[in-house]
Amino acid sequence: MGKKKADLNLDLIDLYSNLLNEIWGKASELIGETLLAFFILLTIKRTPDKSSILREIRVSEDGISLEAVRKQCQDASPDDVHRALQGLVKNLFNVFTVTTENVINRELFSKVLPKLREAEKMVSR
């Protein structure tokens, strides 16, 4: 039998938290923490999120925290959690495409794609 919804949500959040922190580490080296924080906050506001999960993400010059998301999403649908966080990552890459002419995307694509696929598999089980 599959995992309980709350456990699956926590696993998804852990995966996306690690992914977003990897993105943070590399992208902040290239464009700086302040500009990256601005891009992420802008992306959060522009990403559709019917479950309101993205509103709980905390962004500062120190990085990204999904701790409040962990607390809020216990009863959320794993599909909603995945869609919201996947949408954030995809839209952030769109911002990087426009603002850095794919420089950041080229650096991160090989790390991000396998994790997005892993998240898809987790939700589809």
Label every PLM stretch briefly.
Residues M1-R125:
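Long, compositionally biased intrinsically disordered regulatory segments in eukaryotic proteins
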